[in-house]
Amino acid sequence: MAEPRKAGDEAAVAGSDSGGLDLTNPRHVRALYLDTLGRTPDGDELELAMSSRPSMLLRLLCGSIGFWQHWYEEQLYYFLLLDNFRPHDPGPGQRLPDLLAAGEISALEAVRATVLSSAFHRANPGNDTFVSVVFEQLLGMTVQREPALLEAGKRMYDGHRASLWGQSGKSQSDVVTITCDQPDFAERFLDREYSRLLGRAPARGELRRWTAELRAAPGDFPQLVIEWLLSPEYSDRLQRLRRKSNRQFLQGLFVDLTHRPPDDETLERCRRALSAVADAGPLRSVIARVLLGGEHIDLPGRDDLPVQDLVVHVFQRFLGRQPGPNELETFITIFEQCECETDTLVRAVTTHWEYQYY
């Protein structure tokens, strides 16, 4: 297992198969789950996915409660509403992911509700900071180039009647509402969501088409995500490894090892620890070792499978691929000479750099 060849935040996949989305390839299934649900599939989900058609699987995933929970966490990260700035939990049935999954609100309405929250106000105090962040994050605007709009927004924030894009208001909620009424709001939202999922900017013509579609049918955001993930551009993305976010790494690690996601308290505690260091890679490996040592992991025993099949099983389960010839030979040799157990192989894989990518 060689060191990665990185380009930005990506690393090349050695020997990956060319072509489109292939659900018989466990790495493709793992990538879909990480992108849509923020975690890897458990064994039953992987088996079901590998016997499904891509469009059928994506209809099952996109728009599910798990999809919206992951999407919402990504929005909180984008707006830096973390830890003490996290929005108040209104309780089951009233959380934004619950309302989104029930079709009671749209993604654009959920973004607006997030920016209207008291948490967003606490995280961005003062008229200059608040208005600048709203314009920049919702519209992609460079406020230094629009001083008149910035000043009008600040007056409106302070309770004085002012006009933005021809609409009048006199409160900070008016600043947000008027900003969300602009056509660039939907376009900026789709631009960043496409880039988040595919790791590249969308074609301008396609972005304009999607924007028009979403403004006409605000509830159709999951259908756009399905279109993106079935596109040749996503298949191309799968030829490159992308680094997992801290949440993706933690949730995927727990599902891979224990077949269940971590509880909220454990997830947030580990996420904060990873976010506190400049390079989270070594600490990610420590968390993997600790989890392996402290949990009952359902793994085939040393004598349950021929050693070659055991090595292949570990690579497919945790990396979604077959081991290369040199990897297979090395792992077999170490396993036989050291008389170790299967968890030693798992530790080697889950603490390696490649496991931190997908």
Residue ranges, per PLM feature:
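Composition-driven recognition of low-complexity segments enriched
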Residues: 2-358
